[in-house]
Curated annotation (Swiss-Prot):
Keywords per UniProt: NADP, Oxidoreductase, Porphyrin biosynthesis
Summary of subunit composition and partner proteins: Homodimer.
Protein name (Swiss-Prot/TrEMBL): Glutamyl-tRNA reductase
Pathways involved: Porphyrin-containing compound metabolism; protoporphyrin-IX biosynthesis; 5-aminolevulinate from L-glutamyl-tRNA(Glu): step 1/2
Record remark on domains: Possesses an unusual extended V-shaped dimeric structure with each monomer consisting of three distinct domains arranged along a curved 'spinal' alpha-helix. The N-terminal catalytic domain specifically recognizes the glutamate moiety of the substrate. The second domain is the NADPH-binding domain, and the third C-terminal domain is responsible for dimerization.
More info: During catalysis, the active site Cys acts as a nucleophile attacking the alpha-carbonyl group of tRNA-bound glutamate with the formation of a thioester intermediate between enzyme and glutamate, and the concomitant release of tRNA(Glu). The thioester intermediate is finally reduced by direct hydride transfer from NADPH, to form the product GSA.
InterPro entries: 4pyrrol_synth_GluRdtase, 4pyrrol_synth_GluRdtase_dimer, 4pyrrol_synth_GluRdtase_N, GluRdtase_CS, GluRdtase_dimer_dom_sf, GluRdtase_N_sf, NAD(P)-bd_dom_sf, Shikm_DH/Glu-tRNA_Rdtase
Reaction it catalyzes: (S)-4-amino-5-oxopentanoate + tRNA(Glu) + NADP(+) = L-glutamyl-tRNA(Glu) + NADPH + H(+)
Active site per database record: 50 (nucleophile)
Enzyme class: oxidoreductase
Organism per entry: Pseudomonas fluorescens (strain ATCC BAA-477 / NRRL B-23932 / Pf-5)
Family according to the record: Belongs to the glutamyl-tRNA reductase family.
A Pfam family hit: GlutR_dimer
Length: 424
């Protein structure tokens, strides 16, 4: 068995590359099944967010290159381009990486809690696809436990910040009085929910939530006294919007340069602040060329995020130690599991030999042999049979000069100095 964690993230790839390697929710089940089928992977899961796309795989023999080729072909990328941004972690390092990701230690915003929920969703989808078995399943459970301990035992989650928080913080820097501003939020997922909460707490004058389905938009809008509209209503809402923050799972841009130009004319070129958190992008990059638009992507939030990192650096060290302990403990338990099948087979063999000797003993008793003779024969027969295979193998190893194996056998059978004198 061997674990592999492979992917790209906000530190290794630009938003342009990340959006081309992203998986939509609709793609995941089919992609997972194809991944296992074409790369000889026994178990697999895919984590795809705005900041990372990662594959977690269990194989008999690690083949990162085969997986990279599959990922490049699936997304119609050149292998060289993908290799330039990709990272690969194997076995212990893969386990540690997964735990760091789930704990928020590898996030754009250190310690952000949303990633754990996204990791749990990745696990649920892989189970639905039938690509998670006992080994990867155990790794996910250990990962969730480690992340929970980090959240509970350290201050990594205090004064919570996120990409959503960073976007709102940037808006505060641009608009001195948010209570006079109107905001248009595109999408109705977890990130937009956080944005809505932050804006509501800051007393933004009016919030509008635009979504593909009005029902989903209404559910979110009701929580914060906002208004719900459809995506088709965005052009009209743009005219009144000072702040636009977008985060959907759309594969195509939702907001184009033409629509924004029209809105700016009706606004008499009053500036609009925009943050596109989505990957792939919701807002056409050309929108940023307009004079009265301030367009930011997730990659532009780094400076805002950097300010929030300072308060979490101390907690991060303690969190890293907990992750290291969790990863080491998991690998120890996993290696112990490797012995289970051997022990089971050895026990079954021993029980078969015992039953054979027991049947001989019962026949001897039935034929009138004395109990002491039968017990002695039973003990000798069982001892000889149990020692036969090990004796043959030890002689063979000795003839081959395998002193290391002989030393291991001495340890295995507890034959250290003076062991024969000890009472069991």
């Amino acid at each position: 068995m061997a674990f592999l964690a492979l992917g790209i993230n906000h530190k290794t790839a630009s938003v342009d590359v990340r959006e081309r390697v992203a998986f939509t929710p609709e793609q995941l089940v089919e992609a997972l099944q194809q991944l296992c089928r074409l790369t000889d992977s026994r178990e697999a899961a895919i984590l795809s967010t705005c900041n990372r796309s990662e594959l977690y795989i269990e194989q008999d023999h690690l083949s990162a290159d085969v997986v990279l080729r599959w990922l490049a072909e699936y997304h119609h990328l050149s292998l060289d381009e993908l290799r330039a941004s990709a990272y690969v972690h194997e076995d212990d390092a893969a386990v540690r990486h997964m735990m760091r990701v789930a704990s928020g230690l590898d996030s754009l915003v250190l310690g952000e809690p949303q990633i754990l929920g996204q990791m749990k969703s990745a696990y649920a989808v892989a189970r639905e696809a039938g690509t998670v078995g006992p080994l990867l399943g155990r790794l996910f459970q250990a990962t969730f436990s480690a992340a929970k301990q980090v959240r509970t035992d350290t201050a990594i989650g205090e004064n919570p910040v996120s990409v959503a928080f960073a976007a709102v913080s940037l808006a505060k820097q641009i608009f001195s009085d948010l209570q006079r501003s109107q905001a248009l939020l595109i999408g109705a997922g977890e990130t937009i929910t956080l944005v809505a909460r932050h804006l509501h707490d800051l007393g933004v004058k009016r919030i509008v939530v635009a979504n593909r389905t009005l029902e989903r938009a209404s559910l979110l809008a009701e929580q914060f006294g906002a208004h719900a509209v459809l995506l088709s209503d965005i052009p009209q809402e743009l005219v009144h919007s000072d702040i636009v923050i977008s985060s959907t799972a759309s594969q195509l841009p939702i907001l184009g340069k033409g629509a924004v130009e029209s809105a700016l004319k009706l606004r008499k070129h009053k500036p609009i602040f925009m943050v596109d958190i989505a990957v792939p992008r919701d807002i056409e990059p050309e929108v940023g060329e307009l004079d009265d638009v301030y367009l930011y992507t997730v990659d532009d939030l780094h400076e805002v995020v950097a300010e929030n990192l300072k308060s979490r650096q101390g907690a991060a060290q303690a969190a890293e130690e907990l992750v290291n302990i969790g990863a080491e403990d998991f690998m120890v338990r996993l290696r112990e599991l490797a012995a289970v099948d051997v022990l089971k087979a050895y026990r079954q063999q021993s029980e078969r030999l015992r039953d054979e000797e027991l049947q001989k003993a019962l026949r001897m008793l039935a034929n009138g042999s004395g109990a002491e003779d039968v017990l002695a024969q039973l003990a000798r027969g069982l001892t000889n049979k149990l020692l036969h295979a090990p004796s043959v193998q030890l002689k063979k190893l000795s003839a081959e000069g395998r002193l290391d194996a002989l030393a291991m056998a001495q340890e295995l059978f507890a034959l250290g100095e003076g062991s024969s004198d000890k009472t069991p």
